[in-house]
Amino acid sequence: MDFVAIDFETATARRDSACSVAVVEIKDGSLQGSFSSLIRPPENRYAAFNIGIHGITPEDTAEAPGFAAVWPELAAYLAGRVVVAHNARFDMGVLASCLAEAGLRAPTFFYADTVAIARKAWPDLENHKLGTVGAFLGIDFHHHDALEDARACAAIPLRAGERLGETGDLCALAQKLGVRVQPFGGLRRGWRR
């Protein structure tokens, strides 16, 4: 199974306020590579609520690169790939908003939501939050650290594929589960900037 998992953390409720990003690349069902970076959000402004979630502060990102500087390396992982995210609407909205804010073109790739994969693969779980699914799968990780969340997210389709005997192709797994794999098209209606 080949795909990329992505996770963003944001500094405020605005989707263009990414302060951390991570991607992990899965090739033939194994971790092939990863990339993570702190990102200086616009004006390096943070909301206390968001700091309480991920612990990243303005001091942490004062000297961090902006999204545009991180983009070339991030884009290399995404272009032409199938990408997964846990609650993909959020992460795809962050990506689209950051691209729009920086005046950058959206890459061509497809994405699926690991919340939907988990709901179909393990419908009896109490909920399908990343922490709950991770605990069920025995994944030890520090939630709301972008790299650790991306790794935990990547484990979901791998483990669902093992459970269902569909370890070769993420799109085939998604089809078997009735989960949509859709094209990323940049900023869409309904995504707050």
PLM feature spans:
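Acidic two-metal-ion nuclease catalytic site recognized across multiple nuclease folds
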Residues: 158-193
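A short, structured active-site edge motif that brings together acidic residues
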Residues: 108-118
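Acidic, divalent-metal-coordinating active-site segment for phosphoryl/phosphodiester hydrolysis
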Residues: 146-160
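Short secondary-structure capping/turn micro-motifs that flank functional sites
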Residues: 67, 115, 150-151
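Conserved non-catalytic scaffold segment of RNase H-like nuclease domains
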Residues: 1-109, 123-124, 128-144, 191
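Buried hydrophobic packing segments
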Residues: 95, 117, 153-157
